[in-house]
Curated annotation (Swiss-Prot):
Residues 239-254 have a biased composition (Polar residues). Keywords: Cell membrane, Glycoprotein, GPI-anchor, Lipoprotein, Membrane, Signal. The lineage of its organism: Eukaryota, Fungi, Dikarya, Ascomycota, Saccharomycotina. One of its GO terms (cellular component) is plasma membrane. Glycans are attached at N146, N217. This is Predicted GPI-anchored protein 44. The keyword Lipid metabolism does not apply. The gene is PGA44.
Amino acid sequence: MLSTNNLLILLIFSFLITNVKSDLGGPCFSMSTMEGFACGLGVHKNIQIITDCLCYIPGYWEQLDGCDKLVRGPHHTPIDGAEICSRASEYAANPAGFTGETDYYESSTTVMHVVMLDFPTYSPGVTNFLDSSSNDLTTTNTDEINSSITTDEVIPSSSSSYIEIPSETLMESSVSTQPSTIETSETSHATSLEVSSIITGVSSEPLTIVSESGGLNSTEIASTPVVITSPTPQPLLETPSQESSAPNIDSTTPTTIDNTVVDGTTTNDATSVASSTSDVAYVYIGGAMGYPSISVALGLVFIAYLV
């Protein structure tokens, strides 16, 4: 049986496992700015590197501030993200002559992550400034990033965050209206079961339905109502598969595409479609919380040791 002291030690150990991030952790990223993560924030030996590619992403710092507040130095003075981007470009242009501050700090709930500008391989416009083995996400080409985050439409920041596109512009090909029901009367020799199997079996090969008035092939069935008669009144047959497959060409409901608007430039939102731009999901990369199996294993070993 565990003693009081051993139980206290176990509780402290459990608290540390579940609340302290490991060295493998990184800063808090916004899931809606994966373009910025791919081209701008490299991770190498727990040093977070700022590049002008990251600074290019509109609104990145505004969203990052929603998760971790940027602070400078021991007094935790708030920092403007644009200032850091400016300093990064200035430092890269002339590292030897740079006299400004190069060390910045990013506070999180558990640890302090150092953001440093003085990285020997950093230069403006270079996205793959780290070895690919250290962070594969930094190998993304600049042109690919630019093409993925920009559009031909430019919307002022004061206007709506959505672009409305009428649905008819997305449907250039003609759509034929297919009948959804088959009527029956009293003069045919075909049963309702046969009619159902014939309609269900319509394929690319022409099929013929034989009736007193002649034959109808599958193309005519798809474009004109079909009336098939039988000796006795039959219930109305419905073909929901045809009805559901025929789009409503009369619908003019606009289709909305969510585009995050920052400083007059539209960007593709990687996580939300037709949702508010303020709804941003955040996630911590790595850390002890990211490896629960290790924590559980260590806890079991510790308990076994105490027992």
